[in-house]
Amino acid sequence: MADSTTMEHDGRGTKRKREADGGSGQGVGKGNSNAVKEGYGPNITEMVPRNIFNKGNHTIYHVVKTQKYLDFNYVTNQNPYIIPYQTAGFWGSMWDQTDIGNNQSINIMKALNAVALGVTWIKGEITFEVYSVTRQRLLTGTTNQTTWDFETSQNMFIADADREPENFNLETVAATGPLAQQTTQTLLFNSHNDRYTKYELPQRNQYTREINFQQLTNNYMWRPLDISKETNFRSLIPMSEGVYTKSENLRQTEFTYETTTYATSGATTRQTLFRNRTSYPRMHIAQPQVPDETGFMKFRYQVRMSTKLHLNFHMYPDYATNNNLEYMHRQTILLPQVAETNGIVACMPYEINTQ
């Protein structure tokens, strides 16, 4: 039969046999679920009762991409460079505005920010590729004339401070970039080297680091932010050390709270949320410690760095007005920030999960 039902004859007349799993098999307006039914006859379908327009969970997945060619120069200072991936601006090329207007993945992010209620930060990816290594050395037989040699066999070091907490300053836009700061410790190979886990990256190879961001609970979302705009350089990636206040250089609290005015009513929303701590150790790019006649060999690495930031934008529902937006904004939380003066980013290598 063309219908969803079948006809059988058992000698006592005709009976109708129905399917057993809801839909037309359970009759009009009935079924195994609690959803309301809509439609007619055997083609009846389920409908979520409190979301008639099915727009309350509309999301758009987007990846913000950047690619930079970097010059890690250790001629004058052999200390490791700090990769400040804990800053939100690192992922949006905030530190390098060159041709940023032509980066369509950033432009799409800005457009989605304008129509999104909140954002879920999923994960970030950082890929390094070494395409050239040179070494500065003294010319043979001289004491003050230098030259450059290609070092095709020399690897670059990537290191994590995953043994104890570290930090770095965040007082300028430039500090969100990978070439702005070097450590104050002497090297990765000194008496304190046990603080770092080191990896070697050969030339013509790629190394990708994946960072899983702090996930919010209870339907909370992060508030949309233009991570390419220079005035937002104090904002950090989702982390559970709490909101960093103006009154102290570094305030760490188990609770994140804020007071923000929304909508024309002037009503104030207050949000409090408990989250588990998340590990974001400080990351470094370094050269090896190899003695020579000038102290230590001085290398220079040309590196291609690519980043991918995976975001999920939660769109405003249809027929959103000031009254209900104020209610929904109670589910959005500002990204953590450092203080306006003497801002410090804490790089915690510990993860404590109490679940």
From Swiss-Prot:
Chain's gene name: VP
Gene Ontology BP term (one): symbiont entry into host cell via permeabilization of host membrane
Positions of region (Disordered): 1-41
Signal peptide annotation: none
Functional note: Capsid protein self-assembles to form an icosahedral capsid with a T=1 symmetry, about 22 nm in diameter, and consisting of 60 copies of size variants of the capsid proteins, which differ in the N-terminushe capsid encapsulates the genomic ssDNA. Capsid proteins are responsible for the attachment to host cell receptors. This attachment induces virion internalization predominantly through clathrin-dependent endocytosis.
Chief location of this protein within or outside the cell: virion
Organism: Aedes albopictus densovirus (isolate Boublik/1994)
Keyword vocabulary terms for this entry: Capsid protein, Clathrin-mediated endocytosis of virus by host, Host-virus interaction, T=1 icosahedral capsid protein, Viral attachment to host cell, Viral penetration into host cytoplasm, Viral penetration via permeabilization of host membrane, Virion, Virus endocytosis by host, Virus entry into host cell
Extent of Basic and acidic residues compositional bias: 1-21
Subcellular location(s) of the protein: Virion
Organism lineage string: Viruses, Monodnaviria, Shotokuvirae, Cossaviricota, Quintoviricetes
GO annotation, cellular component aspect: T=1 icosahedral viral capsid
Record family assignment: Belongs to the parvoviridae capsid protein family.
Protein name: Capsid protein VP1/VP2
Presence of keyword Iron: no
